[in-house]
Amino acid sequence: MRFSEKFDVIIVGGGHAGTEAALASARMGQKTLLLTHNIETLGQMSCNPSIGGIGKGHLVKEVDALGGAMAAATDEGGIQFRILNSSKGPAVRATRAQADRVLYKAAIRRRLENQPNLWLFQQAVDDIILEGERVAGVVTQLGLRFESKAVVLTAGTFLAGLVHVGLANYQAGRAGDPPAVSLAARLREIGLPAGRLKTGTPPRIDGRTIDYSVMAEQPGDSPVPVFSFLGSAEQHPAQLPCWITFTNEKTHDIIRSGLDRSPMYTGVIEGVGPRYCPSVEDKIHRFADKDSHQVFLEPEGLTTNEIYPNGISTSLPFDIQYQLVRSIKGLENAHILRPGYAIEYDYYDPRGLKSSLETKAIRGLFFAGQINGTTGYEEAAAQGLLAGANAALYAQEKDAWWPTRDQAYLGVLVDDLITRGVSEPYRMFTSRAEYRLMLREDNADMRLTEAGRKLGLVDDVRWEAFQRKQEAIEREQQRLRRTFIHPQHVPQEQLQQVFGKVLEREYSMFELLRRPEVSYEALLSLPQAGEGEADPQVRQQLEIVAKYQGYIDRQAEEIERLKESEHYRLPLNMDYSEVHGLSIEVQQKLNKQKPETIGQAGRISGVTPAAVSLLLVHLKRKSRKAGNTADQVA
């Protein structure tokens, strides 16, 4: 049966990628349908109850700067907030929040249900409708045919999902949810390059059976941080601490005793797990010299006693899980509410995607989230927003948009995926970005909100707040540059207190703010300083720009130097065997991967700087023959 309504964009899946994709497409004015197997699980946090962290918090801020929901929902559902790396430079500082699962999910669903241009429908998708090499819609379990111009697949771990506990396994998308077996088979039938990955989760514990008195308490930060640029601490519900304990030699012996029944160590699981979120059995194998590992006990919410023991993800048999949990200090009488498990699932080689996250093989079909080989809510949300926005642009027959590596962590994420592919679940870190001083959490709006506004992703409220912030920063910067502090007009004791020494001459306030030891707040305590700005976001920007301007300028110059070759377009139908001087290995890799730009080509493993030079020569030669200049990205 054909559904009566036709849509511009269909989103398959209601996790973190799917919800951001649906909201983005609808914000851009496209008639959007979100299909999910269960409306009750929209925005569900399937694994740990936290958002953000190193690199991940940066992605959340970028999603927020583009009008996305994740940061705002975290502000409404966050029960503990911390700034990680607070003692380090601004490039690597990152926000992390524990979230109440129920409140977070409710905040996401409320946004979905109240978003104009967005329809929700509860049905699992079994098939994709193709017309030649173009997508035309989807077919659900009931045989309902939904037609659309573009489709975004955000299937998470559901594609041929297989849950493992010990040597027992069963088909599931996650514990308690059915897998997408028919859809997985259909995608493989189409011939897209597939592989298997795995991820895992720890057993959940009843907090009433935990002895917190023998553990270290880990409170949140004060004053309490916020995630969204439009957020405030008043939005946060009650705040709770986390607790820290450790595994021990007894724990490790118990784990070793069960390895002969581990699906990972007996070869039952084929998929590769995440390097940076390993199972506890993987930890004791990889770090055999360590006699203990940290375990963070994280509350799942304000209205439940359920605790998430971060650090002991496992797929060992339940009897081993029971023993290992009870061997940990403070958990001697712990009651397990849900067993830990591993889940194995299909993913598709992201080198088969364009920078827009559209598949190269099928026009109008976009992938986002774990289907692309990533791990993490934040990575999924960022991809979802980008895929949803580009699906909306595709439906309008407009050019695709994506941020570059020097513009956003989202740009780094996508570029890494489509040029290098994945051999294990991909997690974002600040170390993956060459220009991380430019890509700070605090300036995500400065980098992306204007682009989001042009795309139609950013509403009037956010845009007006952003403009006010920009104007306040510019106004105060000018004031700091023209306001001077004269040492004769300030008591010596106060100068000593603020600057650690006496000033020898007159300085502008901006010059003084550039000093590492001088804060904006301390500067305003001087009698000639004036009132200053009250907005903490404005204050933060003023201080960072003053102190790091030299480094930022040098990085900007480096980016400009690289842009010329970085952005040269490569034709997707180019035959690299025709490029004189390229090795057979490089020819094969380029013909297989079909990079879109010279920059992408240079980041493919095995493609040397010499090979890039040959490509540039080849392009210029062809360009001269054609009588025009090489096409460059605008």
UniProtKB/Swiss-Prot annotation:
PROSITE patterns in the record: GIDA_1 (PS01280), GIDA_2 (PS01281)
Binding site for NAD(+): 273-287
Disulfide-bond pairs as recorded: none
A family per Pfam: SAM_GIDA_C
Binding annotation for FAD: G13, G14, G15, H16, A17, G18
Taxonomic superkingdom: Bacteria
Protein's cellular compartments: Cytoplasm
Entries under InterPro entries matching the protein: FAD/NAD-bd_sf, GIDA_C_N, MnmG, MnmG-rel, MnmG-rel_CS, MnmG_C, MnmG_C_subdom, MnmG_C_subdom_sf
Single GO term (MF): flavin adenine dinucleotide binding
Cofactor: FAD
Record's signal peptide: none
Single GO biological process annotation from the record: tRNA methylation
Gene3D superfamilies: FAD/NAD(P)-binding domain (3.50.50.60), GidA associated domain, C-terminal subdomain (1.10.150.570), tRNA uridine 5-carboxymethylaminomethyl modification enzyme MnmG/GidA (1.10.10.1800)
Entry's Gene Ontology cellular component terms: cytosol
PANTHER family given in the database record: GLUCOSE INHIBITED DIVISION PROTEIN A (PTHR11806), PROTEIN MTO1 HOMOLOG, MITOCHONDRIAL (PTHR11806:SF0)
Protein family per UniProt: Belongs to the MnmG family.
Its biological purpose: NAD-binding protein involved in the addition of a carboxymethylaminomethyl (cmnm) group at the wobble position (U34) of certain tRNAs, forming tRNA-cmnm(5)s(2)U34.
Subunit and interaction comment: Homodimer. Heterotetramer of two MnmE and two MnmG subunits.
Protein name: tRNA uridine 5-carboxymethylaminomethyl modification enzyme MnmG
Organism of provenance: Methylobacillus flagellatus (strain ATCC 51484 / DSM 6875 / VKM B-1610 / KT)
